[in-house]
């Protein structure tokens, strides 16, 4: 491995709880991984923050570990992927953050977005593809400008920079020489017009955000600057938000190709090509842009609770000791025994968008066992995925013939077979499951000519296992209709019992 003939790409994956660095070789094999956790801070209810300095330190430790077995001169490119929407403002001269990073999960800006929703919903959805929500960066920027002393005045004088975490890391890596982001991350700020591929002045004026604080928006694969942090100059040539990077890492380059990432929640993205199709129940977002003024778009559906339901089964009910025990337990029964589990712990996301829905286990009889409930929990992940995919097909007019999967639960063969059965399409699991990091490594390598085409990347990508549906159409219909009935009963429950949203 140490011979200088080997070329490597370094992917920085800046997540919500940890910073990771993954080193790939030119055949997209993983050579080494570094990972360091950093804390989240909760100064008040609904507030979620990071210290950007701690993120930087964790990211550099992860890099050091990932490249410990090679010479840094062998790294031909760096790619950066990140938790999206999380917002940092910093002093342009000193580089010091003016406030902690406000994380995507933070809900403090609800009053701002409620006002936007009431008065400007259609305009914002038409221009940005997003719905007014504290999730996105725009209201977080406004909050910092309005609430941190002197920051608005400094911003008006051009002394403040804004960035999502990709932008902040690129700024740090280049010693302040590059203030950039890519199309995919820009599309998550709620300030970017995804039709014109430029920042939207009407929304900026509405929120009183000075345009001078914004980074330059560039394609997802080009040289943005050179890292000076590893001892020699290395081009930073790939940038994408984590979910979009995973779509690219699944080589979903064609219209209608789709991926599901099963994590704490799940994210489902479908490539819809060069036309930003509008959806009633899903977000329209930019998947990536490989050249200036041209973007590939995606429909995105987010499911709030999938893997988190397994954690609840483990920690809340103490039904299992470790998460991996759920699959063998669920395998002890042939089917769910008529039991359905709706994991609406915090409401339901796409396509229901009901903050008042609450969790539900229904269909219990004297014959119900722990194994039936375990199976119902796993199956709920597959049902929710079908909910989103059905809406995607209906609203896009694009039919889907296979689903690519990644994330923790994608290792579970029982769940993946059930996913194929309930969808009636093939489910494909890749050999390398680190699709987010691999996607941005691909973008970075393309940006420096390590690979020359999407076809070349597709030929390197390898399948681990394909799951072929084997369930009858009649059984599929009956099971799914039971799920829809269970969801109906879960919806609005917090209103019935006067619970908090």
UniProtKB/Swiss-Prot annotation:
**Entry binding sites for glycerol:** 84-85, 135, 242-243
Q: Which Pfam families match?
A: FGGY_C, FGGY_N
Q: Which PROSITE patterns match?
A: FGGY_KINASES_1 (PS00933), FGGY_KINASES_2 (PS00445)
GO cellular component: a single term: cytosol
Positions binding ADP in this chain are 16, 20, 264, 307, 408
InterPro entries, per this entry? ATPase_NBD, Carb_kinase_FGGY, Carb_kinase_FGGY_CS, FGGY_C, FGGY_N, Glycerol_kin
Q: What does this protein do?
A: Key enzyme in the regulation of glycerol uptake and metabolism. Catalyzes the phosphorylation of glycerol to yield sn-glycerol 3-phosphate.
The reaction(s) catalysed by this protein are:
glycerol + ATP = sn-glycerol 3-phosphate + ADP + H(+)
Query: Which PANTHER family would you find in this protein's record?
Result: GLYCEROL KINASE, SUGAR KINASE
Q: Which gene is the coding source of this polypeptide chain?
A: glpK1
- What sort of enzyme, by top EC class, is this? transferase
Pathway in which the depicted protein is active: Polyol metabolism; glycerol degradation via glycerol kinase pathway; sn-glycerol 3-phosphate from glycerol: step 1/1
Q: Which family does it belong to?
A: Belongs to the FGGY kinase family.
Key words, A-Z: ATP-binding, Glycerol metabolism, Kinase, Nucleotide-binding, Transferase
| Binding, sn-glycerol 3-phosphate | 16, 84-85, 135, 242
User: What is a single molecular function from GO for this protein?
Assistant: glycerol kinase activity
Q: Where along this sequence does the record place binding of ATP? A: 16-18, 264, 307, 311, 408
Stated EC number for the protein is 2.7.1.30
User: What's the protein here called?
Assistant: Glycerol kinase 1
Q: Which GO terms describe its biological process?
A: glycerol catabolic process; glycerol metabolic process; glycerol-3-phosphate metabolic process
